[in-house]
Design a protein with these regions (language model features):
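Electropositive, surface-exposed helix/loop patches at the edges of structured domains
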Residues: 175-192, 255-280, 315-330, 381-400
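A conserved regulatory-domain signal marking ACT and ACT-like small-molecule sensing domains
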Residues: 289-421
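A conserved active-site cap/scaffold subdomain adjacent to cofactor or substrate pockets
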Residues: 246-294, 300-302, 312
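Nucleotide/pyrophosphate-binding catalytic subdomain
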Residues: 1-263, 268
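Structural motif
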Residues: 1-2, 31-34, 73, 140-141, ...
Length: 421
């Protein structure tokens, strides 16, 4: 058995959805669990509906949702030629869930309403794709993942209840695979014990695919993207990127830790634990080799892997009485960062000072600054960049740092980090 995950970009247009169907058809004789995200731009549209609803602009929220529902109906008609009664009823049934929410007087936290509304995106897209596959003769079963993925009620970042999810996944999926080779479900969403919808947070669709791969002991996972492979840098920021054909789970986690927009570490863990290889391939050209991510002991020669984080703040915290920055002071400072939910990207301490590079987040930063200034003198530089290079060479540093001023630098055998302006 394999697991495929398709992101929203892969089905954003009717043309792409048809191409994805052709790709899936190549695997119709194999057992494949297919995890599909919301159609491209749908989640952003749903977030606007949540914002309008929570701001008490109920009429605006209802109008925006009516437009989104009409968009999906049109998409389905264009894809299928004409919607079947079964699909029309399914879409109406799903949309009614959100309409009920939008008719309520809200008295719960924003995150609760976010999950009830945003979760509809994956359900609509998968319903349409499953109907289309069956219409063109590719038999596929549609499953509501909320009947399987059980979580706590941490809305927008729910924690999976592994034992319940494992039991349900094995029961439901194994029953489906006895009748079908292809099973379609959703990523990113789940439900609590009382069947309240939740979302799984950042990279939730990839994570869903990895969780089910772990539970079902599949042979591989493939994430289909609109890029040819993993690259050594963001092509929007670095013009001369090169593909990475093979990489270890450990190296991907290192890349993600330093801020690379690759596979999230929480997606890697369930796969690494079961030694399940992960492929990143291009849905625009299925014949491209892509990238293999796996456990291996062989030496891999990597190109310099570069990450540039923008909008950084360099914060210097000094003791007022010239006392040393010892474990006691460090503990106090770390506690304040944790309380303000601020992640430190790079740190360095000297005798009487502590320096940290952090993402700019005005609301949280102001809270942190106020707390620090009660006991310490604080200086800051803003609008900076954090430049990280794994497997660096002097040539690449000379090329990329031309006309840059380095404010802080740390270097190990394989990694160099610099705060620059």
């Amino acid at each position: 058995m394999k697991v495929f995950k398709f992101g929203g970009a892969s089905i954003e247009t009717v043309e792409r959805a048809r191409y994805i169907a052709e790709l899936i058809n190549d695997y119709r004789d194999e057992k494949v669990l297919i995890v599909i995200s919301a159609k491209g731009k749908t989640t952003n549209a749903l977030e606007k509906i949540v914002d309008a609803f929570y701001a008490h602009n109920i009429s605006e929220a209802q109008q925006l949702f009516a437009a989104l529902e009409a968009d999906h109906q049109l998409y389905a008609d264009q894809l299928l030629g004409k919607r079947s009664d079964a699909l029309s009823n399914k879409l109406t049934e799903l949309c009614t869930e959100v309409e009920w929410v939008l008719s309520e007087q809200h008295d719960r936290p924003y995150a609760y309403y976010y999950d009830q509304i945003v979760s509809i995106g994956e359900l609509l897209s998968t319903s349409i794709m499953a109907a289309y596959l069956n219409q063109i003769g590719i038999a596929a079963e549609w499953i509501d993942v909320r009947d399987i993925m059980k979580t706590d009620d941490t809305y927008r970042d729910a924690n999976i209840q592994w034992n319940k999810t494992e039991s349900l996944a094995k029961t439901v999926f194994e029953k489906a695979f006895k009748q079908y080779n292809l099973v379609i479900t959703q990523g990113y969403i789940g439900s609590t014990d009382d069947n309240t919808s939740v979302t799984l947070g950042r990279e939730g669709s990839d994570y869903s695919a990895a969780v089910f791969a772990n539970i079902l002991d599949v042979e591989s996972v493939t994430i289909w993207k609109d890029v040819p492979s993993l690259l050594n840098a963001d092509p929007k920021l670095f013009p001369n990127t090169v593909p990475i054909e093979e990489i270890t789970f450990h190296e991907v986690i290192e890349m993600a830790y330093y801020g690379a927009q690759v596979i999230h570490p929480k997606t890697i863990k369930p796969l690494q634990n079961k030694d399940i290889p992960l492929y990143v391939k291009c849905f625009l050209d299925k014949n491209l080799k892509g990238t293999l991510i796996h456990n291996t002991t062989k030496a891999i020669q990597y190109p310099p892997i570069m990450v540039l984080k923008t909008n950084q703040i360099l914060l210097q915290v000094n003791t007022r009485d010239y006392s040393f920055i010892t474990e006691d002071n460090l503990s106090k400072i770390y506690t304040l960062f944790h309380a303000c939910k601020i992640k430190i990207n790079m740190i360095q301490n000297a005798a009487i000072s502590f320096v940290a590079c952090i993402d700019s987040n005005p609301e949280r930063f102001d809270e942190l600054l106020a707390a620090l200034e009660k006991e310490y003198d604080v200086k800051r530089n803003e609008h900076l960049f954090l430049f990280t290079v794994r497997h660096y060479t002097q040539n690449i540093l000379d090329e990329e740092l031309r006309n840059r001023s380095i404010l802080l630098e740390q270097k190990t055998r394989q990694t160099i980090q610099m705060v620059v302006q």
